[in-house]
C-alpha cells in the first residue's frame, strides 16, 4: 500500500521509480494486491498503472478523492479494464447501525442531517465544536486543495459565493445564466462561463453532484437546468450557517444520495409543466420517485401524485415522505 501524500513515499513520485519499486517487491507465484491512494500526484502515473495492469499476478486498486483520477489519458488507457467503485458518506441506515437498537429513529434522523453523515463524526458527535472544526477542515481541504489549487482559481471569494448559492439552493432547478444574473444583482458580478467552470470544478471534487433534467414523455435529456446536491447535508451549516431550515430539500438531498449509492443514472424528470424529483435508469429498467416532507395535506398529496400518474409507462413509481401514518 502506498499513500502519495506521505513524505516517506516522495522518492516514488515519478512513474519509472514507482514501477521499479513495486515490481521489485512483488511476490512471485502469488497474487499481489496493490493499493495506491492519490496516485495522480505521481508524474506520469498513467504509464505506471498501465504497465502494472499487464502483470498477471497483480490485483490493483487505485483510490482518489475527486474525478480527476479517471479523466483524460488514464480513462483512455484503461477503457474496459477497470471497475469504478463509488464511495459515499454513511447512508441513514448505516448511521442507525451505530446506535442502540431501541434508538428513536426521528431523533436519529435529525442528528444525521444536522451534524454529518461522515463516519468520523460518529466518534465526536457529542462535541459540537469538534464536529464543526472537523467539517470546516474537510470543507477547506476540498475547496482549497482540490478546487482552488487544481483549477488555479484566483478569486476564492467568488468561488465561495457560488458554493454558498448552490448549498442554499439544493433541490432547486438551477440555470447557469440565472446563477450569474442573481449573483450580479447582489453585487458580485460574475460571467456565466466562470460560473460554469466553478461548478464543473466543484462537481469534479465531489462536494456537489449535478443531476440533469429528463423529459419523461419525450424520453430525452433537456439541455438547460440542473439540480445540485451536497455530498453531506451537514456541510450546509459550515457553508452558509443554515440549520434546521428547508427540510423538504434536505430530505430530497438524502434521497438522492441513497439512490446514487444503489447505482444507475439519475435524472430530474419533467412531464408537461410538472416535475418528477428523480428518474432512475438502470439498463432497461426505470423507476420514478417523488419526495415530500409530508403529504397529509390533500392538495400536497394531489400535487405529488399527479406527475407520477401522468407518466405513460408501467415502471415502478414511488412517493417518499417522512409521514409515519399507519
Residue ranges of each PLM-predicted region?
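Catalytic cores of nucleic-acid endonucleases
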Residues: 269, 293-326
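Short glycine-rich substrate-engagement loop in P-loop NTPases that contacts/grips substrate
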Residues: 1-33
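Structural recognition of the conserved hydrophobic beta-strand(s) that form the central parallel beta-sheet
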Residues: 35, 59-65, 86
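Conserved P-loop NTPase "ATPase switch" module shared by AAA+ and STAND
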Residues: 27-45
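Conserved ATPase-coupling elements of RecA-like P-loop NTPase cores
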Residues: 9-13, 39-49, 53, 72-73
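Accessory nucleic acid-recognition modules appended to NTPase machines
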Residues: 128-286
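Interdomain motor-coupling "hinge/lid" segment immediately C-terminal to the ATP-binding subdomain
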Residues: 65-67, 71-173, 209
Amino acid at each position: 500500500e502506498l499513500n502519495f501524500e506521505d513524505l516517506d513515499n516522495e522518492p516514488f513520485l515519478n512513474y519509472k521509480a514507482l514501477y521499479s519499486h513495486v515490481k521489485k517487491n512483488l511476490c512471485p507465484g502469488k497474487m499481489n494486491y496493490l493499493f495506491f491512494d492519490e496516485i495522480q500526484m505521481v508524474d506520469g502515473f498513467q504509464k505506471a498503472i498501465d504497465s502494472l495492469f499487464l502483470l498477471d499476478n497483480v490485483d490493483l486498486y487505485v483510490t482518489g478523492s475527486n474525478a480527476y483520477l479517471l479523466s483524460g489519458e488514464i480513462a483512455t488507457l484503461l477503457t474496459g479494464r477497470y471497475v469504478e467503485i463509488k464511495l459515499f458518506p454513511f447512508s441513514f441506515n448505516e448511521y442507525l447501525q451505530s446506535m442502540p437498537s431501541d434508538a428513536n429513529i426521528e431523533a436519529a434522523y435529525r442528528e444525521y442531517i444536522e451534524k454529518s453523515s461522515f463516519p468520523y463524526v460518529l466518534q465526536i458527535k457529542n462535541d459540537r465544536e469538534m464536529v464543526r472544526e472537523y467539517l470546516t477542515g474537510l470543507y477547506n481541504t476540498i475547496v482549497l486543495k482540490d478546487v482552488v489549487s487544481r483549477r488555479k482559481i484566483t478569486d476564492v471569494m467568488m468561488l465561495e459565493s457560488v458554493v454558498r448559492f448552490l448549498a442554499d439552493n439544493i433541490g432547486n432547478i438551477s440555470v447557469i445564466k440565472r446563477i450569474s444574473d442573481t449573483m450580479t444583482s447582489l453585487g458580485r458580478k460574475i460571467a456565466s462561463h466562470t460560473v460554469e467552470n466553478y461548478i464543473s470544478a466543484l462537481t469534479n471534487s465531489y462536494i456537489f453532484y449535478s443531476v440533469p433534467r429528463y423529459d419523461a414523455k419525450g424520453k430525452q435529456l433537456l439541455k438547460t437546468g440542473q439540480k445540485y446536491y451536497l455530498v453531506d447535508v451537514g456541510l450546509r451549516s459550515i457553508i452558509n450557517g443554515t440549520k434546521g431550515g428547508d427540510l423538504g430539500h434536505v430530505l430530497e438531498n438524502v434521497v438522492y444520495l441513497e439512490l446514487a449509492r444503489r447505482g444507475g443514472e439519475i435524472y430530474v424528470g419533467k412531464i408537461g409543466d410538472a416535475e418528477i424529483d428523480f428518474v432512475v435508469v438502470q439498463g432497461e429498467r426505470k423507476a420514478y420517485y417523488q419526495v415530500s416532507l409530508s403529504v397529509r395535506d390533500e392538495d400536497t398529496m394531489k400535487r405529488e401524485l399527479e406527475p407520477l400518474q401522468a407518466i405513460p409507462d408501467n415502471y415502478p413509481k414511488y412517493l417518499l415522505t417522512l409521514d409515519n401514518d399507519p
